[in-house]
From Swiss-Prot:
It comes from the Bacteria. Residues 174-176 are annotated as: G5. GTP binds at residues 19-26, 81-85, 136-139. Gene3D superfamilies: P-loop containing nucleotide triphosphate hydrolases (3.40.50.300), Translation factors (2.40.30.10). Mg(2+) binds at residue 26. NCBIfam families: EF-Tu, PRK00049.1, PRK12735.1, PRK12736.1, small_GTP. This is Elongation factor Tu. InterPro entries: EF-Tu_GTP-bd, EF-Tu_GTPase, EFTu-like_2, EFTU_2, G_TR_CS, P-loop_NTPase, Small_GTP-bd, T_Tr_GTP-bd_dom. It is an enzyme of class 3 (hydrolase). GO terms for cellular component: cytosol. It catalyses: GTP + H2O = GDP + phosphate + H(+). It comes from Enterococcus faecalis (strain ATCC 700802 / V583). Its EC number is 3.6.5.3.
Amino acid sequence: MAKEKFDRSKSHVNIGTIGHVDHGKTTLTAAIATVLSKHGGGEAQSYDSIDNAPEEKERGITINTSHIEYETETRHYAHVDCPGHADYVKNMITGAAQMDGAILVVSAADGPMPQTREHILLSRNVGVPYIVVFLNKMDMVDDEELLELVEMEVRDLLSEYDFPGDDVPVIAGSALKALEGDESYEEKILELMAAVDEYIPTPERDTDKPFMMPVEDVFSITGRGTVATGRVERGEVRVGDEVEIVGIKDETSKTTVTGVEMFRKLLDYAEAGDNIGALLRGVAREDIERGQVLAKPATITPHTKFKAEVYVLSKEEGGRHTPFFTNYRPQFYFRTTDVTGVVELPEGTEMVMPGDNVAMDVELIHPIAIEDGTRFSIREGGRTVGSGVVTEIVK
């Protein structure tokens, strides 16, 4: 069977369902797909087909995730749903499923619960920029005032974690009733998706961001100069562009790209996703090394101290068998290189067990080009023992 062509005329947005266990995330996911399929946007999905999420490996971590797609009139959505709480934690920290926005599902009958709070905090830390709220199971709540009370609680909770709680769209409905075909509740699903369409902006594409390429390898070509190779992570670079070499060394240096090659062919420019060799003017072979990045000037800076949200692999995932404490000194793997760093745990956290997630402070022995949202692995002797994301630059 010929593959269907991906329709690029609609803008593409990645979203997911978050919230406390049993509040109806998976049922809502099935309901959205099913209701939209009646309006010509994708395939209907059953609860079971989504709940039996396949196992995936991301940076050596086992994550169960369901990916489904559906369409509204203006957009194509890729939607991720996870069966277990631990899967959400891993997913959000590793960035296995990058979310441009999330639908927070809260049971109107129960109100916000511990994982509701934890998912909001995680969203804030790992950079999920927008949240829309679905108050589920409203058919189980007879009291209009109770519904209003739960809505207020959710708005306050969002504001507590720096989301605009007063402005966030909140839609009440019943995912189960909608999935069963009750028209008044199907209407609520369409209302929810209209809010998602309007409130969650279309993300900036990687190619529109400022240029950055992690350096994987360096070699010199006699008579031509030094070439740095790597995969362009974001933006685009043109022959003649000025770039900075950032990281490892304390000082950032500038150079000009005098040539761009891909598959031994010369190009005028390269963009996000391309594997290239960049010929650099006036750069000696020893002036640049793996682990640095080439970047558009003044867009990323080298740092040694940062705060991070980290998931520590369990023993079953090939992680550590024992806990670690403050002053733990593993390797932090950023993009293409390992750098030793020292961990400081938050006050009141004695130790971190395999399988935990934790906020920590890190100080690296060399500066690395990092910014909020930069992802990294924690390794010991080449074995991955953790995965993290930078939540704040300290120095």
